[in-house]
């Protein structure tokens, strides 16, 4: 049977992040992708110029349509900017007995804010207890824990432990913004702390990296891969996609990663 994954996220008109990046990732990894759109963004490699939220009612209707027909094996949640939307998503997950990969998208790669302040508490209170794994970057982890942005791996670990106390099953704190030759993420499931290093890649093409990573984790879970293995494989896929990104030459700003690097010829 074909593995199916669902992305609940915003649409990126430039195609590099959000729903578009998620569906590309699912396809690249051999998983059928379904989608629930939470917002429509006017966005390109240079930034976000406008955001139109989709109503909570339509978000619920999309979830009902997908879950009532498709045998969804994994769910990934990305951009959800409104408290009402978060409540609708949490309700849908509970009704259909689903947990999710939660990418707490708060700030775009360009630096534009994507999550309203009153929605941060709702995300922590309603979505994190339903998370199989939550994947914050350093700024998001700091915002979620009320601490300063981590400057080293020891503080990353402390913030991972704090996020676990929200009820999440596991946490992956992404350390790509730390200084150094490595981009090291920390995975914590309440018992074991796993260090996941990778060589740092110097490139302007890093738009949608967080979306791609969380979608790749969901793709692995949809195929029945254990969580830590899905996380490790997703990080390897993202690293390869970033390494190949310069071949695309898309946009005038921070371009997308190369989701189909294994298949497209130069």
Swiss-Prot record:
Catalytic activity as recorded in UniProt: 4-amino-5-hydroxymethyl-2-methylpyrimidine + ATP = 4-amino-2-methyl-5-(phosphooxymethyl)pyrimidine + ADP + H(+); 4-amino-2-methyl-5-(phosphooxymethyl)pyrimidine + ATP = 4-amino-2-methyl-5-(diphosphooxymethyl)pyrimidine + ADP
Transmembrane segments: none
Class of enzymatic activity (EC top level): transferase
GO biological process, one term: thiamine biosynthetic process
E.C. number(s) listed in UniProt: 2.7.1.49, 2.7.4.7
Alphabetically ordered keywords of this record: ATP-binding, Kinase, Nucleotide-binding, Plasmid, Thiamine biosynthesis, Transferase
UniProt KW Acetylation keyword: no
Family of this protein: Belongs to the ThiD family.
Function as written in the Swiss-Prot or TrEMBL entry: Catalyzes the phosphorylation of hydroxymethylpyrimidine phosphate (HMP-P) to HMP-PP, and of HMP to HMP-P.
Protein name: Hydroxymethylpyrimidine/phosphomethylpyrimidine kinase
